[in-house]
Amino acid sequence: MLVEYEQETKSLVGVNPLRRTTITSARPALNGYQKCRCFYCFREVSIIQGSQAMADVDHFFPHMLKQCDNNKPIDGVANLVLACRECNRGENGKFEKIPTPDLLERLFNRNEYLITSHHPLRETLIAQTGLTTANRQHFLQDAYNCSIFFVGARSKKWQPVPQGDAIF
């Protein structure tokens, strides 16, 4: 079963050609690795509804990448991270910008950690990105290259100023 993020309900859902089933809220599933920290700047975030520091669920590769390649699971958990509001939609936020290669490596390491730790999302990550480490590296690099091509090679890569200690 593949898992995708459903914007309308703000939850992860199982993708089944016959039906869609909500399986869990996106924030807690992603928070297992991030431990209430923004993926990008390490600022403290919350997964508690209504909190001032409520984490956004962000697409690492811009959502508009769907227009570049329909086969990329842009709404899949392999491409979703928790982000503070400032990084996701603040004045100097990521929006549709391409993250730096350092952040791409961080995403790869996050996904590998979830796979090797036998996290409940392990099978979904493998299904979305590949069976082997090399396949998964290729998948992310291909998505990165597609993003650069689609968004623009001259576009400056985005990286925030750290707001906390790097804990992952």
Residue ranges and their predicted role:
Residues M1-S46, M64-I74:
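Short, charged surface segments at domain edges that flank catalytic/cofactor-binding sites
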Residues M1-V15, F95-F168:
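Extended charged
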Residues C36-F39, G93, K156:
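Intrinsically disordered or highly flexible coil/loop and linker segments, enriched in small
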Residues R37, D56, A83:
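The −1 position to Zn-ligating cysteines in a subset of zinc-ribbon hairpins
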Residues F42, R85-N88:
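Cys/His-coordinated zinc-binding microdomains
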Residues F42-L80, G93-L107:
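Histidine-centered nuclease catalytic patch
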Residues N79-L82, P120-L121:
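Short amphipathic alpha-helical segments
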